[in-house]
């Protein structure tokens, strides 16, 4: 059985969408671990509801980034994680984690990269007046939203859209497509079985 981890910092709606899809489709895979850098985040409650172990840590309690990333690596190895999916994890991945899991860390970003990297991507797109927005799933490298693109999905924006409606539509895209990309990268077929 393939095992993956999800890293999140907040509410965890993408985490829930991934795990729900895994269970509904009975994947031959396991969400083996949630990693969270905010011990009070709602996503931890979601993990508990699904009986998924979590590693919640306070970055300031570690000497430096390398130290907390080493603690994360120990948890990933303990849970035999093969793939890491960032889902609203609001930290850049450092050298320590990249050296251990390079090419096995993916992220979902709410824009059609390379446009609008970083925070508030949907707001940036809305203020720019673009006619097309979307999501990007990409491999993580040392930069911010700069890794090789795996998949993109787009939506058209019209004059009736508001920032809120665009955000809602982007979230729906994320919840639909991120689990599909994870399943594909785990080498599972459409029924969630090993391909």
From Swiss-Prot:
Annotated binding of N(1)-(5-phospho-beta-D-ribosyl)glycinamide, by residue: 12-14
GO-annotated cellular components: cytoplasm; cytosol
EC number: 2.1.2.2
Coiled-coil ranges per UniProt: none
CDD domains referenced in this protein's UniProt entry, alphabetically: FMT_core_GART
GO molecular function terms noted in the UniProt entry: phosphoribosylglycinamide formyltransferase activity
Top-level taxonomic group: Bacteria
Catalytically driven reaction(s): N(1)-(5-phospho-beta-D-ribosyl)glycinamide + (6R)-10-formyltetrahydrofolate = N(2)-formyl-N(1)-(5-phospho-beta-D-ribosyl)glycinamide + (6S)-5,6,7,8-tetrahydrofolate + H(+)
Site, Raises pKa of active site His: residue positions: 145
A family per Pfam: Formyl_trans_N
InterPro entries for the chain: Formyl_transf_N, Formyl_transf_N_sf, GART, GART_AS
BP GO annotations: 'de novo' IMP biosynthetic process
Catalytic residues, chain numbering: 109
Family: Belongs to the GART family.
Function field: Catalyzes the transfer of a formyl group from 10-formyltetrahydrofolate to 5-phospho-ribosyl-glycinamide (GAR), producing 5-phospho-ribosyl-N-formylglycinamide (FGAR) and tetrahydrofolate.
Stored NCBIfam families: PurN
Protein name according to UniProt: Phosphoribosylglycinamide formyltransferase
Recorded name of the encoding gene: purN
């Amino acid at each position: 059985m393939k095992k993956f981890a999800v890293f999140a910092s907040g509410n965890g709606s993408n985490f829930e969408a991934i795990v729900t899809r895994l269970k509904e489709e009975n994947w031959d895979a396991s969400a083996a671990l949630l990693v969270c850098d905010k011990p009070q985040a709602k996503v931890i409650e979601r993990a508990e509801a699904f009986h998924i172990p979590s590693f919640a840590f306070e970055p300031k309690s570690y000497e430096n980034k390398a130290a907390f990333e080493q603690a994360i690596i120990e948890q990933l190895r303990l849970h035999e994680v093969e793939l890491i999916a960032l889902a609203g994890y609001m930290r850049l991945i450092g050298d320590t984690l990249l050296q251990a899991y390079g090419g096995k860390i993916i992220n979902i970003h709410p824009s059609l990269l390379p446009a609008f990297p970083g925070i508030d991507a949907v707001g940036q797109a809305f203020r720019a007046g673009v006619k097309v927005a979307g999501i990007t799933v990409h491999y993580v490298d040392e930069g911010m939203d700069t890794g090789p693109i795996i998949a993109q999905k787009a939506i058209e924006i019209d004059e009736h859209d508001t920032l809120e409606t665009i955000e809602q539509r982007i979230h729906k895209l994320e919840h639909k497509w991120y689990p599909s990309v994870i399943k594909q990268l785990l080498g599972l077929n459409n029924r969630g079985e090993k391909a």
